[in-house]
Every structure is written in C-alpha cells, then in structure tokens.
Amino acid sequence: MWPLWLCWALWVLPLAGPGAALTEEQLLGSLLRQLQLSEVPVLDRADMEKLVIPAHVRAQYVVLLRRSHGDRSRGKRFSQSFREVAGRFLASEASTHLLVFGMEQRLPPNSELVQAVLRLFQEPVPKAALHRHGRLSPRSAQARVTVEWLRVRDDGSNRTSLIDSRLVSVHESGWKAFDVTEAVNFWQQLSRPRQPLLLQVSVQREHLGPLASGAHKLVRFASQGAPAGLGEPQLELHTLDLRDYGAQGDCDPEAPMTEGTRCCRQEMYIDLQGMKWAKNWVLEPPGFLAYECVGTCQQPPEALAFNWPFLGPRQCIASETASLPMIVSIKEGGRTRPQVVSLPNMRVQKCSCASDGALVPRRLQP
C-alpha cells in the first residue's frame, strides 16, 4: 500500500509551470473565476467617471493588502543526509502504543526534511496463539496499523492528526516502516521550546461485523528481547543541506542569467493599466510585482534518487505565494459599484528547489 501522503492532491499554483511567469490569460482567468463571470463585463466610460470608491471599500482593500504581505501559501521543498533517532514506548495497551522521540537538535541547521520513517519491530506470534484463532483466511489474518501525531496543547487538551496507515499480516514479523514525514513537519511548526515528538500507534481489525476476526490482537510491537536497544522504535530522518541543494533567494539584477544560474526569484512587473480588458474594470492596483522563479537546481546523488524513485527531478518552483487584492467595478441592476476581491497565489514570495512528487505539508491548526 502506498503511503497516504502520496495519494494527497498536490498544491498547484495558477502558473503554467512550477516557477513559470504569470501570464495575462492566467490573471484574467483567476479574476473571472473569483467573480463567477464567464466574460469581461462591458462598462460605460460615463459610469466610470462618476464612480467614487467609498472609504469603507478602500479600507477593506488596504486591510487585504497588508494581510497579503504577511500570509503566505506554502509549498514544499526537498532534502538529503540520514540521521536516526531512538525512541521509547511511553505507554502501551493491548492495541495502542504511545511513542516519544526527543527531537531537539536532531535536524541539522539550514537543512530540509525529505522523509521521516518510523520503524517498529513486529513480534512473531506464538504458534499456540495462532492455533486458538483457528484457520485464518488471508483477509482475516490482516490488521490495520495507524500512526497519528499527538499534540498536547497549552491548556492540556490533546489533538491527533492522521499520518500513515497500512495493513500488516499476523503471520509476519520483523521491522515495519511507516512514513511520518508530515508528523515531523507538524512538530517543526510548534513554537519553542518544542515538546517531544509523540506518535500514537493503534492496531485495529480491518473488517467489521459479526464474522470479523479478532486476529488484530495478535499484532504487537515491542522489543525483540535481543541486545539492548535493538527492538526500540527508530525514527530515520533524511535531509539535504540547503547550502548545496537550496535556492539562493532573490536574483542578482547585475548578473546575467545563464544555464548555470542557481534557482532564484526574479522581478517581474505586471502592468494592469496596459491590459485592454482591465480598462474601466480594475480600479486598483495599476500594476504589481509578481516575480518569477528562474534558474536551475542541483540534483541529489544517484543513491538518494534510488531510495525514493517516486521523486522526479528537482526544479526551481514558487514555494511560497501571496494573494493579490484588487478593487474592481461591478455592474448590478443598472448601477456600477466598486468591489474588493482577492486573487490567491498571484505573487511569488519565495523560490525553492523541489522535487516533483515531494510532500506538500498541511499547516498546523490551532
């Protein structure tokens, strides 16, 4: 079964490519969708000359303008290097385990997480226990193992987030791997000092009903009982050093662009006053800096690409964007009035090197 996060829809910018320049057609299309229009409205010049933008409309526009400079939509970047963190069972019940990992200083500075893998050792089931359950069909001999990130809020309440889920067979034993990249991404968003990383692992029956098997109770994750620490839960952290594999920030306006230019953010001005369709329709702003992502990204070593074959070549993309507030004129019932709208993901705030297929993390909710 593929990890859950591979099935999630990736966040897509309204750009032709990951870091491509915003076009006039894309800007117009976004504005029409926001206003739920099929075509550009026809507005009389005489009506526009009489139109006055009320103070409350302009105030709303200013508020959105300020907010757009603070709120950003985030994409996700890529990384390399390997680090292993040993964890421990904080609490265990028949079908639920609470794991704790001390994470402070485990992620190198100026690095980015590619993948975090939780490894748990599944103990072999004694033959006598299997015999008591009778002959199990392949379906009834499976259990669903679910991993959730557990966050303890400041008020003492708990919040869980689903991270990964997969089927395991009661007939198998050994190390099982779960993708917990998103849990570490959530943990990184916590304010300092951060609490340890808490992962809740639950084992449940896959099929419900009167004929469902109770074989899921046979699945246990614990120490092998071999040398000390051999069966402890392990958290593998794979990162890349952004000094080598990241973007460089804003482009140097003095330096010419070449094939070897490192990924950077380049200024690009969108002149709304020069667009025919915007005349008499878009009142504010007259234009804006949209920026675009240009340049190339260093590719990871072949060994890393082999470990994650689902990741494509790394590209220079817009990893953080901001909305664009506008004041437009709307005609309703023979009257023309101004209206404030906000177009999402119109201005590039940050460029990064990312691999096609890489995880796009969710924002941590309060």
Swiss-Prot record:
It comes from Homo sapiens (Human). Mesenchymal cells of the endometrial stroma. GO terms for cellular component: collagen-containing extracellular matrix; extracellular region; extracellular space; platelet alpha granule lumen. This is Left-right determination factor 2. Disulfide bonds join 251-264, 263-316, 293-351, 297-353. Its main location: secreted. Required for left-right (L-R) asymmetry determination of organ systems in mammals. May play a role in endometrial bleeding. It is found in: Secreted. InterPro entries: Cystine-knot_cytokine, LRDF, TGF-b_C, TGF-b_propeptide, TGF-beta-rel, TGFb_CS.
